[in-house]
């Protein structure tokens, strides 16, 4: 089997945690790697962003990333990329003709890629599986007041994909309900495929490893640490954590606590300086350390150094950061939204918070920070919980889904593009 994956707006090889690179990038590369191990040939098509990028990057046996030139390498925001969908589609067609490569199935990721996949599906007459990862209607329902709403144009494009893709692959039952509620999706064309985590890389280590992680980050061994990992944008909620930490210090100015915020700028509404200034205004700038995004091999040290990882997102289709943290032996406090109640076993591997009130978050943080016995037990249970999720299992589900889609292939090129 040969699969064309499409990730038009962001390369799976890009560093997660900055720009448009995040959990989706991890998902695509991790599942493609595992599918390739099963003998499935996977080409991931993405838009070239540097002239120095080779057109074909061989990642592993059976796995390639294809960089397609479409528009200028730099200077285009994600919001401007719809102007390059035709160029990107044309680039894919030119590449496949020149290389004489054909595919059995298309798997598109995110709505921009889905629009490309929809057209190619009809041209090539092969099945299209689409994974949205995020949805405009859901983001607009949960967004923070400081965040820019998603456009009606995006919602329309998503509706077209819901109506025309052969299979809609979702991360959780919650996401399935969102598709049905907001987009009137046919439940018979929706399949739940649970994401995973790299439980070999993200592991708790031992006391010596934790001490080494703290030394590398310049954190005293006996200081409590709360970490945030993710893109610095309002939708991910770093402002919620900063305000909650300020509330904690208002209650107890002598609290022995440090906060790590690890991530880079993303989108038009915030930069690291935005959150540094917020911390200064709230008087907690000396308690918070900002770190640039780190590759997975270094990110595990951040998870291990933390006593708690906070995930105050306004929505997550699953929550890979929560799963990686738990695999590393660290309990999680997360918002009760999207797929996070599945990623975090409430009361066993962490806590879930209703809403985004800084005081509610301060209460949750204090509950675990001040109860060493419960926090340590949750960290131990978190490791076992995370081990029930793996990328190999995710890929096995996808492989089965692919085979079913090919077996049930009924693509006649008659879909409505109006």
Swiss-Prot record:
Gene3D superfamilies tied to this protein: Glycogen Phosphorylase B
Binding of 1D-myo-inositol 3-phosphate, residues: 9, 20-25, 78, 110, 134, 154
UniProt-annotated binding residues for UDP-N-acetyl-alpha-D-glucosamine: 15-16, 23, 231, 236, 294, 316, 324
Superkingdom of origin organism: Bacteria
Known catalytic reactions: 1D-myo-inositol 3-phosphate + UDP-N-acetyl-alpha-D-glucosamine = 1D-myo-inositol 2-acetamido-2-deoxy-alpha-D-glucopyranoside 3-phosphate + UDP + H(+)
Enzyme Commission number(s): 2.4.1.250
Positions contributing to Mg(2+) binding: 303-304, 306, 330
Pfam families assigned to the protein according to its UniProt record, in alphabetical order: Glyco_trans_4_4, Glycos_transf_1
GO terms (BP aspect): mycothiol biosynthetic process
Keyword Transport: no
Protein keywords: Glycosyltransferase, Magnesium, Metal-binding, Transferase
Matches recorded under InterPro entries: Glyco_trans_1, Glyco_trans_4-like_N, Mycothiol_biosynthesis_MshA
Molecular-function GO term, any one: D-inositol-3-phosphate glycosyltransferase activity
Role played: Catalyzes the transfer of a N-acetyl-glucosamine moiety to 1D-myo-inositol 3-phosphate to produce 1D-myo-inositol 2-acetamido-2-deoxy-glucopyranoside 3-phosphate in the mycothiol biosynthesis pathway.
Family, per entry: Belongs to the glycosyltransferase group 1 family. MshA subfamily.
Binding partners and assembly: Homodimer.
Protein name: D-inositol 3-phosphate glycosyltransferase
